[in-house]
Amino acid sequence: MGKNVVVIGTQWGDEGKGKIVDWLTDHAQGVIRFQGGHNAGHTLVIGQGAAQREYKLNLVPSGIVREGVRCYIGNGVVLDAGHLLEEIGGLESVGVEVRSRLMISPGCPLILGYHVSLDKAREAARTQGKKIGTTGKGIGPTYEDKVARRALRVYDLFYPERFAEKLAEVLDYHNFVLTRHLNTEAVDFQAQLDAAMKHAESLRPLVHDVSAALYDAHQAGHNLLFEGAQGTLLDVDHGTYPYVTSSNCVAGQASAGSGVGPSMLHYVLGITKAYCTRVGGGPFPSELDIETDATPGHQMSDKGREIGTVTRRKRRCGWFDAAALRRSARINGLTGLCITKLDVLDGLSELEICTGYKLDGKVVDLLPVGAEDVARCEPIYEVMPGWQETTFGVKRWDDLPANARAYLKRLEELCGVPVDIVSTGPERDETIVLRHPFGA
């Protein structure tokens, strides 16, 4: 039997999961996406010098840039067929073989044009201060249709008459909402049908029973890597609701969103920045000013190049929040942590760690459940000395500055999860390994 590892973001997304998934695929034969859609963005930097290439992926699992690794899109993913085919074409144009190594579950709900129209119209209608910060890509409305049992799924594409009947029914409902409630234009039935059917034959060879394929791979002794998107604090159930995404981003979804049994998941790796970031609206207790020069927040934003891969919006930045990570660790059952972007903190004289909050006159050591309570939290900080030496590209634990090691050990103590990996740069080999998830 192989060993299977789940990689999860523990904050509000953008933790650096793509690089770690790519690095781990050196020991995996398969990589699986199990939730989200093309609202997720992973940036991979592969190669050295003039041969270096940057890949920006949204739907295709990060393992695709590793030769011979099979990639799977599980039933928990919502699929924009046009975007997927465009992404595949982009990869193939630079010599990455995709189609022979990619499987798509027939159960993936399809993102169609009316989902995008609904997403954008709803966000535009929200008053300032209540905007979610959606990417406007139709993710939320597609998940709504899935739960309401009216979604069109990938396998529906291969039955044109049935697809047209279902489309007419669901479009009648959504056009009523668009025109009567949101005061925007209706979506044309024929245009939607033609757009969907255009992609059917291109997708057909890629569609397989992913659940069965993963079971067979596991039985054959393959190591499998489950690639989470977004982060735990954006989870629709466990995040800062309603400022969340529309899917479950936690480790438990790896099973539900791919069709493998929970007992087949052996190790959960939580990816965590050495500080915190957030894109879009919602409470952020340890948030700092990122606009004022020569401040810690500005350094995090500028040195960390904190711009959203998908949205191109500036990410909000703040001190590491151990109380938030403590909740993430429990929800996900984390086996180990991977700390990323440690070098962004190089040169700061002091570092602060949020260890808990004051809420209604009481001290709490765990991120509250509701966004309203989180917004009222006053962070409690512990101060630690910084370091002046560089940590960028360091490959051995003992070569890190003493204060950097002390900072990492303190994070470990506060969160109750061992730091197994430290990422010190975007390259594959800029990684310190204390314990390998695959036992290598």
From Swiss-Prot:
UniProt keyword terms in alphabetical order: Chloroplast, GTP-binding, Ligase, Magnesium, Metal-binding, Nucleotide-binding, Plastid, Purine biosynthesis
Localization (cell): Plastid, Chloroplast
Cofactor: binding comment: Binds 1 Mg(2+) ion per subunit.
Binding of GTP, residues: 13-19, 41-43, 315, 341-343
Pathway(s) of this molecule: Purine metabolism; AMP biosynthesis via de novo pathway; AMP from IMP: step 1/2
Cofactor(s) listed in the protein's UniProt record: Mg(2+)
Any single GO BP term: IMP metabolic process
PROSITE patterns documented for this protein: ADENYLOSUCCIN_SYN_1, ADENYLOSUCCIN_SYN_2
HAMAP family: Adenylosucc_synth
Extra information: This protein may be expected to contain an N-terminal transit peptide but none has been predicted.
Protein name: Adenylosuccinate synthetase 1, chloroplastic
Annotated source species: Ricinus communis (Castor bean)
